[in-house]
Structure formats: C-alpha cells, structure tokens
Amino acid sequence: MSTKLCQRIARTATLSPTSLVPRSSRLIPIVSSAAVRPSSAIPTRRPFSTTESRYLANVQAGMDKIRDAIAENFGGPAHNIGTTSFSLDDTPDLSGKVAVITGGSEGIGYGVAYTLIKHNLSKLFILSRKREVFDGALASIASELGQDKADRVHWIQCNLEDWAQTAVVAEQIKKDTDRLDILVNNSGRGIMTAGLTSYGVDKHMATNHMGHVVLTSHLLPLLQKTAEETGETVRISNQSSNLHSAAPKGTQFKSLEEINEDVGPNGQYGRSKLAGILYARYFDREVTRKMEGSKGRVVMNATHPGFVSTKQSVKDIHEPYPISGFAISHLAEPFKKDQFEGAVPTVYAVTMANEGGQWICAPAKAEAGTDLAQSDELADNLMELTRKIISEKTWPKSVAKGCPMDDVVVHV
C-alpha cells in the first residue's frame, strides 16, 4: 500500500460525524428558530390607491373584452373562453312548446332546429325554399334523434322576398297550431351583390328584414295569446351580425331610394343586419313594454352567431368576390365556428333570455353594438319606412293605424 493512500485512510478515520454528511447537504445552512424574524416584523404591502385600483380594473375589463371578442367570433377552444357561459346542453326542456324557424334546414338554422327538437320541442315548423334540403335535414334528425322526434318537424315552403306568400304561410301556421312559443327569424341573404325583388326593393332588406317583419306581424297575435295563456315569456330572435358595423355611416332609413342604393356587398349585408338589431329595439318599446301587467310577455332580441362555416361563408361569398373570397371560404375555415357553435346565442335568446331589445353575442352576452345600432330615432325611421314600403307594395289597406308592429300586416 502506498504512503499517500495510508495517509488518506488515517485522515478519514479522524473525521467528525458532521463532516461525513454529503457535500450537497452541507451546503444547506441550518438556522435556529431564534434567528427567524417574528412575523410581526415582516413589512406588509400598502393597499392599492384609488388610481391603482382603477387602472387594474381597466386592465381586467380590457382583457375580458378580448376574451369575449374571441369567443363571440371563433370556433373550437376559442368558443369557450368568454366571460359568459351557456352551451347547447344547457337548453331547458321544451316539452309542450311550438317553434317556427326560417331557414331551419341548413347552417345555423339547422343547428337551432336540431337542438330544440333534441330538448323535447313538441312541434317545429321549418320555413325554407327547397324541399330537398329539408328532406336531408329531416333524415339527419331521424337518424340521430329518432323517428319520433323527426315526426314533430313540419316543412312549409316560404320565400321571404315574396311578402304576400309569406303572409299566406303565417296564416297557415295559425291554423295548424293553437300556440307559438318560439320564433326564429334566421333565414337571410348573405354577402352578395345588390339586386331588387319583384316589388322593386333591395333583396337584402326585403329578405333579411322586411320579410321577417311580415311573418312576425302575422304571427304576433298567436305569440301574444300564448304568452297570456301560459303566463310565460314567449321569445323571438332576429339573426344579425357584427357586420352590422359595415352599414353606411350615413344610414337614415328615410326612403326606398336610400335602401335601394348599391353600397357594395358588405354594405348591403351590414345594413340589413343593422335593421335586425333596430327591429328588436323597436319591438321592445312598442310591444314588450306595453304588455307589462299581462300574465306573460313577448320579447325580441337580435343575435350574432360569429364567424360560422355555412353555405354563405363557403360558397356564396364567391358570388361578389370570385378570387378574394377564397380567403374567407378556405384560408379562414380552420378558425370558423361549426353550425352548432353558431347556433348557441340564438338558442340562448329563444329559450333563456328574459329581457328584450338586446343584441346577444356568443355564448350569452348582450353587447351594445355600433352607435347606429343604439339609436331609437333610427329604429323609428326604419320601422316607419318598413310599414310604408310594405303597405304600398302589397295592399294599401294593410296598414291603417300607423307604426305599431301588429299593424304591419299584409292581408291575404
């Protein structure tokens, strides 16, 4: 054994126990409890000042707005990050209730129809143009929810551009049911080039707004009767959009010439979606509030479905934008909501909302909308112009007492 090795063994034998603790453990200092500062001596942070509290509240509010904007417009995980909570599974039981949905055979309308039937709606009238599209929707309902649920769904052909025919459809519904709890004004013309109906009225306004006014006005007595007899809230929704912001800034709704002016695909569409919000505001003032004291009441709200993958955003968008439309139809597709996510705010509006005159965004948040969308004066202009155009283009005697909604009726 070498001399150096013998010296190392001798040194090891004389080490104290603490020196045998592993090196890593010896690096941790052992502090006695007496050396710890009393908790009372630890300085506390002063309370936030009013200015600091206000700043932090503004930051939080700003973050909430961002979360809501994302949830309101995009699908997938983004759909669920908003500050409000509602899912299609939260839809209440609808046993005994009856609904009408325009455009309920496809897209968002189908998402709404499917959900209402799934939650035991007793009868559903779907109004649309093409029987073959409805047949496909009905087959899907039968396959997924059962034939019993499919047997509750009835189809009536309806072209909302044709107000006289729309009136006939509404009168037929009143013969086929003794109650109506839900009306979904969903069908509409998307972002497309300008055109005029046979009445000589802009197609966007004639379909998206005025056709639904005719339908709603004819059905209103039945809606009110249902509210009075059941003592419940009867609900109407108008399919609007955040693209109501694309309506011309100078919109006044003062004349037929104004709404027939070609303001571009986005402007045409945006103006008609602005009308849906204003209609809800007007209805709240002229119908809902006048029912106070009744057993039940009828409320109307407008909704924003978000950026949804539908025929409008995949196919129709190429009519006004043959090339650039691919950005919406294809590149943006991964970020869109599906038809069921797009249906969420409408389902909330027609099953849960108790207040009217709101613009409800996904999943269940009432937003203010643009300045134009908040103008009662503009709402009055819109509905007076609507009354005037419908009465002049269909039957002069159809409106005799002015502007209240129950007077905007095309007599068959």
Swiss-Prot record:
Localization terms from the record: Mitochondrion
Domain of life: Eukaryota
GO cellular component, one term: mitochondrion
Interval spanned by the transit peptide: 1-55
Induction / repression: By blue light.
Class of the enzyme per the UniProt entry, highest EC level: oxidoreductase
Listed EC numbers: 1.-.-.-
Keywords, comma-separated and alphabetical: Mitochondrion, NADP, Oxidoreductase, Transit peptide
UniProt-annotated catalytic positions: 269, 273
SUPFAM superfamilies in alphabetical order: NAD(P)-binding Rossmann-fold domains (SSF51735)
Binding site for NADP(+): 108, 120, 186, 269, 273, 308, 310, 312
CDD domains assigned to the protein according to its UniProt record, in alphabetical order: retinol-DH_like_SDR_c_like
InterPro entries registered for this protein in UniProt: NAD(P)-bd_dom_sf (IPR036291), SDR_fam (IPR002347)
Database matches in Pfam families: adh_short (PF00106)
Chief site of localization: mitochondrion
Family listed: Belongs to the short-chain dehydrogenases/reductases (SDR) family.
PANTHER family documented for this protein: OXIDOREDUCTASE BLI-4, MITOCHONDRIAL-RELATED, RETINOL DEHYDROGENASE
UniProt name for this protein: Putative oxidoreductase bli-4, mitochondrial
Lineage: Eukaryota, Fungi, Dikarya, Ascomycota, Pezizomycotina
